[in-house]
Every structure is written in C-alpha cells, then in structure tokens.
Amino acid sequence: MENIQKLIARYPLVEDLVALKETTWFNPGATSLAQGLPYVGLTEQDVNAAHDRLARFAPYLAKAFPQTAAAGGMIESDVVAIPAMQKRLEKEYGQTIDGEMLLKKDSHLAISGSIKARGGIYEVLTHAEKLALEAGLLTTDDDYSVLLSPEFKQFFSQYSIAVGSTGNLGLSIGIMSACIGFKVTVHMSADARAWKKAKLRSHGVTVVEYEDDYGVAVEQGRKAAQSDPNCFFIDDENSRTLFLGYAVAGQRLKAQFAQQGRVVDASHPLFVYLPCGVGGGPGGVAFGLKLAFGDNVHCFFAEPTHSPCMLLGVYTGLHDAISVQDIGIDNLTAADGLAVGRASGFVGRAMERLLDGLYTLDDQTMYDMLGWLAQEEGIRLEPSALAGMAGPQRICAAVAYQQRHGFSQTQLGNATHLVWATGGGMVPEDEMEQYLAKGR
C-alpha cells in the first residue's frame, strides 16, 4: 500500500484508476508525426511491404475462404455512419457530439469476426511464406493459391504455431493456421469465452486452458514453444509482424474515405477511438492511421476500468514494468478481449508520442451502449467493441484539450469521430441475448 501511495504522490491520476473511476487522460507528451515517428522503429516501407504480402496471398484467401472472394481475397470491413446512435448518446449523456460519428466494423471481418483477423492472420501468412520460400517451394511471383494443394498442407504439417490469447487473437490465428496446415495450440486465459474455445476445437486446434489471466497464458505458450524448434510462437506482447498486419488498415481506411468523398485535413479533423488490451491491435492501427492522415488524425485508446494497463504504463512512463495488479486492480472485466493487466512495452514506447490520450470506462457503460447500438442501429457487438463508443462525448466535453490543439467550433463541427468496433460478429445468439439483457 505504501508503494501505491508513493506512486499516487508522483502520478495523481493513479488514485482514480485505483478507485476504478472512469478516467480520461490527455497526453501532454503527444508530438507531431515527424517528431514521434522515429521512436516507432518501423516505417511506411514496412507497412507497404505488409500490404504487398497480403496482396500476394489474396488469390489464396479468396479460394480458402469463399466469404473473402467478393473482395478479391482482401480481409476488410465497412465504415458506416451511426446517426441514430449519435443522437442516443447525446440524449443519454446530455453532451452534444459535434461532427459525424462513424463505426468501423472490424467486428464483422471475414474469417474470425474481429480486429484480430488483421494482425493474427497476417502473421500466420508471413510465417508460412517464409518457410515455403526458404524450402524453395514458392517464389514471390507464384500464384499463392498453390498453397491449397495437398503437397503444401503436407509440408506445413511438420511445423506448429503457438499463441496465448484472451480469445479473439487465438481465434484468428487458430483458424488461419489450421487452414494452412500447421499444427496449432492456443493457450487461453481464464476470461476466454467458452464459445471461442469450442469454435477453435471444431477447427482441430488444441486449446490449453488456464485458471489465470492473459499474462500467464502468454508466458506458458512461450515456454511450450521454446522446447520445439519447429514451433513458432506468436508473441502478442512484442510482435512487430502483428503490429504491421494491423497498420495496413490506415491506407485502406484512407481509400474508403476517398470513395465516400470524406475529407480529412486540418479543417476536417479525424478522431479515432480504439479499444485497447495489450496494445498490439490499436497500436498498429493507430500507427497506420498516422502514416495515412498525418497530424490530422487524433487517436485515443479505450480500456476497462478494471484493466487500464496501457493508460497506467504510458501515463507513469513505467510501461511494462508495472501491472494493474501492482496497484490493487483485479483485471476482471466483461470486456474479455481487453482483460490485460500488463501492457506491451514495445507498443507503449513506440506509440506514446502519437496518442492524443487514453480513457477508461466501466463494464456497465459498455453494456448500456451495446444495448443502445442494437436498438438504434441494429448492430450487435461484444462488450469490448463498445469501449470506443464513449470517446466522442469525452472529447467534445474536453474544453482544455480542444484549446490546447486550437480546435475552433467550425473544425469540431467538421470533425469525423470514428469508433473502431473490434469484435462481436461471431458471438452466438444465446450469448448475445445475455449481453443485451445487461444493458440499461
């Protein structure tokens, strides 16, 4: 307790985190893209290479997963306006939301129904390509749909993949790895939903369950993989490859906006609200968005009050040297995808200058908004995916933040507020009914 008091003396906001209060923190260390980019350690070239790799795999994905065929083997989600939800939020919270609210439906991405279909699938494909190229079975000029042949499945079956997950990352990596032909083991934390484990097992994936939280599942997965030279461990806490898989979203969103005739510039700012667990997904997406829109995009991470690991790490500057458990928080939340106690040190250090802020919200707030979105827009998400929905009213109420950035009323009126919906498209009906029953 004495240590917590010392921490609070240095970092007053920790008191609100410990009290599980809904908290908003605007980052005083935010810089321009030009100043912040060198600290990421990755470049636009890296993201372009990821884009090209996904293009090489498109013919394979179009055949392996027919639901991607219409998009030519591209795994991408829609952006939709949510005017009725915007009005409902204004009514419920008594706060005008200037500008227009949009929803990015990664919740309905093909293959695994979550944002993790971006990073998880990309890293599995990257590993498969590397093995096939090294073995001389493939060149980058080939039509990658040859990977569907029995010879390739046979080749990949000598190798295995392991990952630790609270659910969605395991789902995307498990389904993709099994399709390629890898043997795959997913180490699941205690908060992983039963239906996600069942779905993985139906794809022939080995699921190892733990009574502990996410950090333990990752650690055990890492250990198990170390003893097998043919086993590749996908490290959600440190993976640059996962990060780049998410980052591709930036250019793609820019193209979607161009198609819709939506302008993002200094007088039409873009605010993006990203649910955050360990940080890889939102970190990678935010990096891609910064490369695509520069200083005209403002990114915020959203976390449960019971799992504010990234806010704690970035705000104190301690990053992965501190966990929410260290300050007496239990890391138990209905937002299972965000139930992470210790943030990625890589993502925190890479992105701390490129985030405008972080905030927390209560589980009940997520349930309430889950219900409102279903009522108003007919869109059903899992609790985690609503974390971003609390962002617009917080930003519109934050006069000091607006003044610091010099936003005029006109600019705010021209703003786009993009809420990144991270999952929920594959939640079974009975489970969804339970979620809806918890909203007020």
Swiss-Prot record:
Residues carrying N6-(pyridoxal phosphate)lysine: 116
Entry-linked InterPro entries: D_Ser_am_lyase, Ser/Thr_Dehydratase, Ser/Thr_deHydtase_PyrdxlP-BS, TrpB-like_PALP, TrpB-like_PALP_sf
Cross-referenced Pfam families: PALP
UniProt EC number: 4.3.1.18
Keyword Lyase attached: yes
Cofactor needs: pyridoxal 5'-phosphate
Gene3D superfamilies per UniProt: 3.40.50.1100
Single GO MF annotation: pyridoxal phosphate binding
Example GO BP: D-serine catabolic process
Catalytic activity: D-serine = pyruvate + NH4(+)
Class of enzymatic activity (EC top level): lyase
Keyword line: Lyase, Pyridoxal phosphate
Assembly: Monomer.
HAMAP family: D_Ser_dehydrat (MF_01030)
Family, similarity comment: Belongs to the serine/threonine dehydratase family. DsdA subfamily.
Protein name (database record): D-serine dehydratase
Gene coding for it: dsdA
